A protein has these predicted regions:
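Charged, compositionally biased interaction regions
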Residues: 1-206
Length: 206
């Protein structure tokens, strides 16, 4: 037996209408003594571990379909709403950031794509935004993204309909030409920071 479920309102993809869902009859409920659970705070940004569930899958998908094995990480931020990716890669040529952006638009349906260098911490917004404001010349390093069909809401729903396209942004440093030479980035390597973090417990800091 199938019934129409919803719409329940709030953010797209969570409690929306699901036409012709199976009706499930609950006959018993069991409880764990020590349940493992996570919360969901519904508002402008949903609060649940989407990056953990999607980022690795997106990395495997993009690398396998594009062939760019120098892509190290594909991060899906909490605010993404299926529209935002940050791609960390070992860039080997001036053309490669744009090629990676094009591959992301070809193989995955995301509106905003930012490519950063391998030493960027994609989970640190200060690091990501610093690279954008420090390395991006809009006319040279930003492109209008792929345009997708408009998402039409189910009848009777009131929900946010995202724009049909976003932008691709090359926020890398290595192969760009600037009017004035850029100084080297004053930042420890990711390997060194991981080694330091691994000893926090030893120093009583964890």
């Amino acid at each position: 037996e199938r019934v129409n479920d919803g719409p329940h309102g709030e953010s797209t993809g969570f409690y929306n209408q699901c036409p012709l869902s199976f009706k499930v009859r609950i006959t018993a409920i069991t409880h764990r003594k020590n349940p493992i659970s996570f919360g969901l705070t519904c508002g402008r940004i949903e609060d649940y571990p989407r990056p953990l569930m999607r980022s690795n899958t997106l990395l495997n998908t993009l690398v396998s379909k594009s062939g760019y094995t120098n892509i190290k990480e594909v991060f899906f931020p909490d605010a993404g709403r299926s529209g935002f990716l940050i791609i960390r890669a070992n860039i080997t040529s001036a053309e490669q950031p744009k090629q990676i952006i094009d591959a992301a638009y070809e193989h995955m349906r995301y509106r905003w794509v930012i490519v950063v260098d391998e030493d960027c911490d994609v989970r640190d917004w200060n690091d990501v935004l610093w690279r954008i404001v420090s390395s991006v010349t809009p006319e040279d390093h930003m492109w209008i993204g792929a345009e997708y069909p408009e998402a039409v809401p189910f009848p009777g729903t009131v929900e946010f309909i995202p724009p049909t396209h976003g932008m691709g942004i090359d926020a890398t440093f290595g192969f760009k030409k600037y009017k004035h030479p850029l100084p080297p980035i004053a930042k420890p390597s990711m390997e060194l920071m991981e080694r330091v973090a691994s000893r926090w417990k030893e120093y009583g800091l964890s």
